[in-house]
């Protein structure tokens, strides 16, 4: 399941930012490494909400700066639904 979540998170990121999926790893920073701007970050948050059917908004951004952070937030949101 973790690999599925990671692959889906990568899909969301690459649909919002023009980057190669292979350039994303656990410590990839959205702003510093992928040069995401504020609109990209909001697109990612809303993309995650749609992809995983979770409640996620721009207030979650401070906790979602790296790929690993995003996966952790998504997993936590999915677990809280159960």
Swiss-Prot record:
Q: Where is the Carrier domain?
A: 3-78
This protein's UniProt keywords: Cytoplasm, Phosphopantetheine, Phosphoprotein
User: What's one GO BP annotation on this UniProt entry?
Assistant: lipid A biosynthetic process
Name the Gene Ontology molecular function terms of this record. Answer: acyl binding; acyl carrier activity
According to its UniProt record, how is this protein modified after translation?
A: 4'-phosphopantetheine is transferred from CoA to a specific serine of apo-IacP.
Q: Where in the cell is it found?
A: Cytoplasm
Residues modified to O-(pantetheine 4'-phosphoryl)serine = 38
Looking at the keywords, is Phosphoprotein present? yes
Q: Name one GO cellular component term.
A: cytosol
The keyword DNA repair is assigned to this record: no
Please classify the protein's predominant subcellular localization into one broad category: cytoplasm
- List the Pfam families: PP-binding (PF00550)
State the protein's purpose: Acyl carrier protein.
Write down what this protein is called: Probable acyl carrier protein IacP
Q: What is the lineage of its organism?
A: Bacteria, Pseudomonadati, Pseudomonadota, Gammaproteobacteria, Enterobacterales
